[in-house]
Amino acid sequence: MDDVKEKVQDPLIEVNLGTKEDQQVTFVSGHLGPEEFDKIMTFLRRDKNCFAWDYPELSELSRKLVEHRLLIKKGFLPFQQAPRRMATNITLKIKEEIERLVRAGFIRPARYIEWLSNMVHVVKKNGKLRICIDFRNINMATPKDEYPMPVADLLVDDVSGYKVLSFMDGHAGYNQIFIAESDVHKTAFRCPSSIGTFEWVVMPFSLKNAGATYQRAMNSIFHDMIGKYMEMYIDDIVVKS
């Protein structure tokens, strides 16, 4: 019996709270009875505007609350990564996503380049691209933020015994935090072909210490709720009821 693995995750039902053209997809437990399912769906449809479904719906956090800094350790000099080639069909999709990020105010054309990283892409399940940056060189030069992070095993214990657990993911949550203006130029990245070079105005996912910066901000915002009504691990939230 040692090789028998217990299935612990509930079966999930995918539901669309939006339209066929503008989908707003979430998931509910497959263990709900018909009455519970109807109540949950009524609640979700009524309050769906409480959630952000796309970049323009996100609001930035105040710089007075949090900014992400990019300090550089002594002995490290700016580094420019060599350019990479990409297929033409991928380049066209990258251009679309770059334009979307510019419209959202997340990135802007790079004006002063010291550090220069390459862009890499990830194809999501829906066929769209996620823009990622190879920040390995500047990450090596950045000192570690020793902010204490939650312990996952303890969080599991803290949510046990509750009847309903609601799981939420911070949609592009890192992108709600500004990069300190003096450090923005260090995030410069190169796109393929003639798309150009850009820099991040907000905090991207692949920067060292981004998780610590986000956790610090969330602990400050939800300090009177964490432990009582919710638990949080970086951008993953569990509401207990």
Region spans (language model):
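Intrinsically disordered, low-complexity charged segments
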Residues: M1-V15
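Retroelement reverse transcriptase polymerase core
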Residues: V8, N16-S241
